[in-house]
Swiss-Prot record:
NCBIfam families: YggS family pyridoxal phosphate-dependent enzyme (TIGR00044)
Name the record gives this protein: Pyridoxal phosphate homeostasis protein
Keyword Nucleus found: yes
Family statement drawn from the similarity comment of this UniProt entry: Belongs to the pyridoxal phosphate-binding protein YggS/PROSC family.
């Protein structure tokens, strides 16, 4: 059994123990890692993978098996919405933060005649360098997304502050997103999922109600230092 396989087994067991019977999705964050590494996780049963950069993402889509369920979790630029959203086995885009980007994604999915799951990214920490819409504007954006025929409002996503992720027993960012979900579900009348928690804090995120955790280094080890355009990718379907 490979190290990656062992890590996945351990993480899945920890998730199951923390989830108290809920289904929590494990998304393997694979940015900068070569396809050979992703295939180790795939062969261990992993199907949901998260990528951050368009060019790297599109290359990996070509090389990985077609039953992979891709999550785009990087900063979403308007100029790249169409290419990213045109991937047929894209499971979700988790970083919608403006109506314009949502409409561009909706248009691309209309061309495919395939609806797409989307998450609204929320800036829960208030940091200027973090993407996402402010909590006070989330309801308006959710309503706009609901009106788009080829988008399925899946839930809310956040990338919390580094300092909060290092806390062992509480996390203000997770609390903000959890409270926001409750109020939005009452307002919109639909269930919403939470995508929050990474390698350093995914178990705590689950305690706050996360339905999807994005784990990278705990599965694959330290991330390579190359920029996405320099990553060597060599594998075949």
């Amino acid at each position: 059994m490979s190290t990656i396989h062992s890590c996945l087994d351990l993480i899945r067991s920890q998730i199951q123990q923390s989830a108290n019977g809920r289904n929590v999705l494990l998304v393997a964050v694979s940015k900068f890692h070569p396809v050979e590494t992703l295939m180790e996780a795939y062969n261990a049963g992993q199907r949901h993978f998260g990528e951050n950069y368009m060019q790297e993402f599109l290359k990996k889509v070509e090389l990985m098996p077609d039953d992979v369920q891709w999550h785009f979790i990087g900063s979403l630029q308007s100029s790249k919405c169409k290419k990213i959203a045109s991937v047929k086995n894209l499971y979700s885009i988790e970083t919608i933060d403006t109506e314009k980007k949502a409409r561009l994604v909706n248009s691309a999915r209309e061309a495919l005649q395939l609806p797409l799951n989307v998450y609204i990214q929320v800036n829960t920490s208030g940091e200027e360098n973090k993407g996402g819409v402010t909590p006070s504007k989330v309801l308006e954006l959710c309503k706009q997304v609901q009106d788009m025929k080829y988008l399925r409002l899946k839930g809310l996503m956040t990338i919390g502050s580094i300092s909060n992720s290092q806390l062992s027993d509480h996390n203000p960012d997770f609390q903000v997103l959890s409270d926001l979900r409750e109020s939005l579900q009452n307002e919109l009348g639909i269930p919403l999922q939470l995508s929050m928690g990474m390698s350093s804090d995914y178990l705590l995120a689950i305690k706050y109600g996360s339905d999807s955790v994005r784990v990278g280094s705990s599965i694959f080890g330290s991330r390579p230092t190359e920029k996405p355009s320099d990553v060597h990718i060599s594998a075949s379907k």
